[in-house]
Amino acid sequence: MTSRRSLPRLAAAVLGVSLTLSAVPAATADPRIPAAPTVSEQQVMPHLRALQRIADRNGGNRAHGTKGYAESVAYVKRALDRAGFRTRLVPFTHDGATGNNLIADWPGGDPDHVLMTGAHLDSVKEGPGINDNGSGSAAVLATALQVARTGLKPERHLRFAWWGAEEPGLIGSAEYVGKLSAADRRRIDVYLNFDQAGSRNTRQWLVIHDDEHGETEAQQAFEAWFAERSVPTFDIGVGGSDHESFGNAGIPSSGFSTGISDCIHEACDDLSNVDPKTERTSTEAIVGVLWKLAATTPRH
């Protein structure tokens, strides 16, 4: 979560009502959409432990331009390569240092209708960034690996991204979007962003509402997923994380956050700053909505 943001609505939402994280049966499934797999804590928390270890052996952080960030990218890329994704590193330079965005494409689906999902992988220099944003990165990685494990055959093309240099000001995602052709921008039906997916003080899931493009199908899908499980949500606008880069380019966006944690941008944003149940719920929500959107008829 970039330090540039001012999110009074987000902070206020964290003061909302309490919730119960136990699973609640979902509504009757659409027979056209394959059932989304369940996610266990054991399928997502090991990624956070790995990111913590990377920070521990690299001066306590995984910031842009550091060995800790490079090792974080290598860890995620290795897992995706083994799972059968087509991965590529997209380099950029900021503040005299080279960084990489990691892009992973799942074979198949309509290349003219891309469903893109992402999270920033860098931390600030002051800490390991395990909730901000190891939690979002781990949830997106676990989702991608579920796609591979189940052999999902989507109607839309699935693309995943892990962004660099979000903390200094959305640099990596802005560089990526800025270099897309007009045709490639039009091919992205929606971009889903996840920043802080495991906050311990979560009261509501904060669903991104793209005001410029109206209520997107993705926002509706997230709100429906949470409502079916009696999980409170709160709408927030586009801004403050990498979805802003896509919104500025006219690309619809959604996603969610679990709110600003008690420790952010400090050394205490370590593994103890993530609630495993919240992280699991977030990952299951991403999986559930991605499965639905991947199987639906593209809008344009």
Predicted regions and their residues:
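Secretory targeting and sorting signals
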Residues: 1-29
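N-terminal capping segment at the start of a domain
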Residues: 30-67, 122, 192, 196-199, ...
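Extracytoplasmic/secreted proteins, especially bacterial periplasmic and envelope-associated proteins
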Residues: 34, 43-46, 50, 67-87, ...
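A non-catalytic alpha/beta surface segment that caps or lines the substrate-entry region
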Residues: 49, 53-107
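Solvent-exposed loop/turn segments at secondary-structure junctions
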Residues: 57-58, 86, 93-97, 108-111, ...
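Alpha-helical metal-binding/catalytic segments enriched in His/Glu/Asp
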Residues: 117, 121-170, 286
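Metal-dependent peptidase/peptidase-like ectodomains
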Residues: 163-261
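His/Asp/Glu-rich mid-to-C-terminal helical/loop segments that flank catalytic regions of hydrolases
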Residues: 262-300
